């Protein structure tokens, strides 16, 4: 998808792997480049599920948006498609039928988080990003940080949603439903709704109460304890390294 035309080269070059040099002339939207991108996208879509309406990434999918930008309105190529069993942990759902082998999740897991759970397996058509020996992610060293989900451009990785369970609990008159929020939640809400740098605690609590929660608690105190404990641990490690 990221191919470009470099003056003086016979073949198209992948922009993500091409090193810039002084005086290089790069063309990004020539007819040849656009046609190549369309062909690559059509091949990707030929091995991709057609369940956009029910996909968790519908409306927020990079693959969907790129296909629209390229003007693709039909899938020209038909043939065998890959089939993988869905896998999930307490936090993450893996639907590898939707994996396009961009390998962003692998980079996030190995190079950013240094966990090393995800890597590319197989070659050619059956290639996919998976766990070692294709073990269920629940049995691996996954720390459920969610960074792989955050960078996934398709619905191959998504959050294991508990919204339906929460709504059922709220609707049950025999249950008292309690919600506990971390300090980061109100900060994130403030950024998402245009209140960056301002407290939205009151708005958040009001919204949760209107949803039907009986009690709303804040984890400020326990967060402070965590910071103190981790700070003490860091000082201990630094002193040990220096001493």
Predicted regions and their residues:
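Iron-sulfur-associated redox domains of electron-transfer enzymes in respiratory
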Residues: 1-37, 41, 45, 159-243
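Fe-S ferredoxin-like electron-transfer domains
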Residues: 4-144, 150, 157-158, 162-172, ...
């Amino acid at each position: 998808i990221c191919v470009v035309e470099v003056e003086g080269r016979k073949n198209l070059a992948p922009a993500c792997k091409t090193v810039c040099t002084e005086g290089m002339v790069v063309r990004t939207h020539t007819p040849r480049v656009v046609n190549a991108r369309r062909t690559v996208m059509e091949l990707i879509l030929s091995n991709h599920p057609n369940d956009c309406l029910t996909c968790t990434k519908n409306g927020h999918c990079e693959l969907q948006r790129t296909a629209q930008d390229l003007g693709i309105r039909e899938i020209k190529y038909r043939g065998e498609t890959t089939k993988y069993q869905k896998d999930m942990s307490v936090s993450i759902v893996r639907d590898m039928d939707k994996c396009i082998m961009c390998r962003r999740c692998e980079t996030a897991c190995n190079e950013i988080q240094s966990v090393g759970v995800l890597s590319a397996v197989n070659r050619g058509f059956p290639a996919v990003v998976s766990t070692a020996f294709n073990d269920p992610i629940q049995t691996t060293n996954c720390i459920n940080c969610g960074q792989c989900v955050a960078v996934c451009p398709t619905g191959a990785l998504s959050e294991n949603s508990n919204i339906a369970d929460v709504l059922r609990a709220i609707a049950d008159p025999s249950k008292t439903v309690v919600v506990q929020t971390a300090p980061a939640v109100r900060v994130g809400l403030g950024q998402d709704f245009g209140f960056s740098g301002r407290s939205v605690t009151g708005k958040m609590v009001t919204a949760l109460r209107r949803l039907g929660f009986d009690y709303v608690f804040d984890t400020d105190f326990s967060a402070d304890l965590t910071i103190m404990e981790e700070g003490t641990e860091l000082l201990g490690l630094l002193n040990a390294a220096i001493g």
